[in-house]
Amino acid sequence: KGAKALSKVDDAKDAVRVGENILKNMNPKDIKYTQDSIANRFSTDRLGYRRPLVDAISELKTGVNPFQNSPIRVFEKNGNLFSADNRRLFSFKEAGTQSIDVIKVDRKDLDFDKNRHIENFFKEFFPKTKGETIKVRVGLK
């Protein structure tokens, strides 16, 4: 299913090329996670605030997209599509969003210093659930 989705990203008539990458709308259910767990808050913003996942999910459920103009980065591995943005993907899935903006990226486009989970993923780590589900950790770590 992921490989078919990826070719749809590549070949879609409504896809938009962004540099070497392709921007497209997809159902978040077709994208897998790259980790077993995620923090219950997003990373610190420029004002020092760590937004809770539940706030983003609540906004999405009311039709407000707090991630406007920030497509989910996806890449292919073993015929499946995986996300480099697990917390945002989780938020969309939990809110029941049917279509999200994704951008297909290559491994070379990912900043491994900021995305250690992606580096580990490419070193043959694979989520226990094969990327189908993810656990939300409680606490501020």
Positions of the model-derived regions?
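Compositionally biased, low-complexity segments of secreted and virulence-associated proteins
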Residues: K1-L81, N86-K141
